[in-house]
Amino acid sequence: MYGFLKDKNMSRIGKKPIIVPQNVTANIDGNKIEIKGPNGLREFLTSKEVEVKLEENQIVVKPKNLSKKSRQHWGMNRTQIANLIEGVTTGFTKNLELNGVGYRAALQGNILKLSLGYSHEVNFEIPKDVKITVPKPTEISINGIDQQIVGQVAANIREKRKPEPYKGKGIRYRDEYVFAKEGKKK
């Protein structure tokens, strides 16, 4: 199909068409893509190096020419469009855990209040594009339709008190493993 792809190290993710579910509508106007689904509406500008077409219930991304830059943008743009569709259908979630004595989280309106062992409470203002829930005082769940924003908000909250390597106290992702160091020995 694409004979110019001779490099064995290159990903071929761009070749895969993106299937558009029944409950999602996709509009393509030049290099602007608009995806609307049950969770909301997302827009995306693709690179000028790729060509995007809507064929029946599939979105196909192709490079415009044989240049290295076109091939680099090909797979990236295909993945970003697939993430748009996933975001408006199921959404993205990041879960954080608070480990430490007295470490707590609580929601108060549009503010996430964190007790992290400092002499004061840390207040985190929740952006309008994400929804934060606190199922337990030591757990935080961040949900949204934009993977980049959800990940950035989770990273910003984690930055308030990163897990330290000796006792593991701090805020960590649920699936994160903190490598424990040994203390000093006499």
Residue spans for each PLM region:
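Ribosome-associated RNA-binding proteins
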Residues: 2-186
